[in-house]
Structures are given as C-alpha cells and as structure tokens.
Amino acid sequence: MIETKKKSAGWVWLIIGAALVLAALGAKPAWYAWLDLSFYWTERTEAELTVKAYAEEQGISIGEYPRSLIELLERNPETQDFVLNYPFREAAEVDLSGYESSDTVPLFLQWDPQWGYEKYGSDFLAITGCGPTCLAMAGYYLTGDENMTPGQIARFAEKNGYYESGYGSSWKLISEGAGKLGLTATELPLVKKKMVDALEAGKPIILAMGPGDFTTTGHYILLTGVEDGAFRVNDPNSVENSQRLWSYEEIEGQIRNIWAIEIG
C-alpha cells in the first residue's frame, strides 16, 4: 500500500515536471499544461471528452474553456457549437434583422454568440441570462425596439440591482424593471383561462419556473400563444423545448409566478 502511494506520487511529480517544462518552452501556460497532461486520470463526461477532442484538433488546451461552459454542455447538448467556439469568440455587432416579424414572438437563446459570452452576474449570460432573455423577447416583439436585446437587458438588470448573487435575476426584473423599459408587467393568478385570455389579447407571458421539465433549480420561460388548447413556449435555453406544445397540466405544478407583458 505504501509502495503504491509512492509510485502514484512519483507519477504526479513527473507530470508536474512535464507541465513546467512545456510552460518553460512557451508551449502553453503551466496550468493549461497540467490540465492537459492530467486529463485522463479520472473518468470523464461526454461533454469533457467532446471539448478535449475539439481542443486537440484546434491545437489549444482544454484549460482555455471555463468549467461553467463545459457544465453547460453537459446539461444541454444544444449548446455544443457555442461552447466549442468559446476560445475563438469575437465581439460582433448584434443583428436582429432575422427576427423581424410583427406577428411572431422571436425566440432569443441566451447562448446565442451575439450576447451569450457576455458576463451577467456571476457567470456568462448563456448560463445566468434567462430572465433578461425572456424580457428581451417580449419587449422586442411588442415594441420593435432593437435595443431590446438580452445583452442590453442584462446590463440594465445589473445597473438597477435586479441580479441577486447566488440566485440570478430577481422577480423584480419583471415586476418592476419592465415598467422602466416602457412595458407593463401584470401579475396573473395560476388560472388557465386568465393565461389564455392574456395570450389571445396579444400579451406574451413570462413564467418563473421551479424544478421540472425546464430546470433543476430556477428558470424563466415565455409563453407566446395558444394552439389546440396547449401553450406555445419560447424557452431561452432550448430550441427543442420551444418546438413543441405544452399543456397546462404539464407546466402547472412547475410555475412559481406569472406576468402578462404589454406596452406601458
């Protein structure tokens, strides 16, 4: 047992030494070299293996990927391209021209490269930005204002204290912040008819959701309409969830609060 520990320690020091040599040669930072050399010591998730393989193809270190983005890919495979492209991200002007439509609420994804790499609160907007993204979807649909983007709303939220550390976007972003943006957020009871009436009147509905189909913690989604008695949903974190109809019975027990949004 003691001998095994000594051998293990020997390998550790050998890898540390190799990492330092690579760093000294300018091949990569010591911490990145250490991450690459020690990667296969433990069992890895599919997301980690995907990122590692892509990093090797591109001649970069897996250390260039923030842990939170790898975990995002673990939770949501839809984000693969967004996560893999992180080291090659470039600042780009936001272009909403592809979303222009007077009769359809646009689906903004919080992990869209146009804004998803921006920081919002404690992490990337791609991870923490469901609230601003939902408010942006509703606001842009109702007003056509191209400043109603997830990035702009996220900055507005931080400036006005609507981001709560360790929690995310507070409900006040919707109930209070909407008014500062020229919108009105009316809280609704958990009654299907009230929700249907609001949607049929052209008012998108923001839902604060608890654990269930959309999240393991907390999340915001947007109801955009009614079809065959079920709700059309814009989930800012999932194209898949946004492509199907959701019955009231499916989501009822997951709803924590409800706001109908209209122009103020």
Report the location of each language-model feature:
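Conserved active-site-adjacent core of cysteine acyl-enzyme catalytic domains
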Residues: 2, 24-56, 95-96, 140, ...
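Active-site-adjacent structural segments surrounding the nucleophilic cysteine of cysteine proteases
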Residues: 12-13, 17, 24-162
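Compositionally biased, intrinsically disordered low-complexity segments
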Residues: 5, 18-19
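N-terminal Lys/Arg-rich, disordered targeting/topogenic segments
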Residues: 1-10
